[in-house]
Amino acid sequence: MNIDIVCVGKVKERYLRDAIDEYRKRLSRFAKVDVIEVADEKTPEHASDTLNAQIKEKEGERILKHLRDGAFVVALAIEGDQLTSEQLAARIAQWGLHGVSHLQFVIGGSLGLDPRVLRRANMPLSFSKMTFPHQLMRVILLEQIYRAFKINAHEPYHK
């Protein structure tokens, strides 16, 4: 299976880049995982709703350029479905059984995702009602994908 993490902005902190690299390495025996970063827009501290919508639209255009025809797209969004690790593992297994060979997870920028990206997604997924830094969310997502593959392989890791 091919998995892309399509995300807005670059990870600046070395410890987060190291964690991302570690989980990509661990996942390499299960899937080919690519992290695709699109440029983020500068967001003024007290931006108007109109400006925020324009920023999300620009970032959304960049994301949409990387979403592949035929890929199953999962958009991380606070209003998405909340799953346990076991449920995510079951979904990934089910998608594979139904012929999904390319899975794309989308992580928006600090303002979230443009509505067009959410409409393109096959499934919205929420990790929590809380807000997480989008750079950290990459690590959390990769860890959960790794955990899902370990669960599906009946290998020790998940407790």
UniProtKB/Swiss-Prot annotation:
CDD domains recorded: RlmH-like
Reactions the enzyme catalyzes: pseudouridine(1915) in 23S rRNA + S-adenosyl-L-methionine = N(3)-methylpseudouridine(1915) in 23S rRNA + S-adenosyl-L-homocysteine + H(+)
Class of the enzyme per the UniProt entry, highest EC level: transferase
Pfam families, sorted: SPOUT_MTase (PF02590)
Keyword hit for rRNA processing: yes
Alphabetical keyword list: Cytoplasm, Methyltransferase, rRNA processing, S-adenosyl-L-methionine, Transferase
Residues at which S-adenosyl-L-methionine binds: L76, G108, F127, S128, K129, M130, T131, F132
UniProt-listed InterPro entries: Alpha/beta_knot_MTases (IPR029028), RlmH-like (IPR003742), tRNA_m1G_MTases_N (IPR029026)
Enzyme Commission (EC) number: 2.1.1.177
Entry's localization field: Cytoplasm
GO MF term set: rRNA (pseudouridine-N3-)-methyltransferase activity
GO CC annotations on file: cytoplasm
Keyword S-adenosyl-L-methionine in record: yes
Role played: Specifically methylates the pseudouridine at position 1915 (m3Psi1915) in 23S rRNA.
Oligomeric and partner information: Homodimer.
Membership in a protein family: Belongs to the RNA methyltransferase RlmH family.
Listed name of the protein: Ribosomal RNA large subunit methyltransferase H
Organism: Bifidobacterium animalis subsp. lactis (strain AD011)
Gene name of the record: rlmH
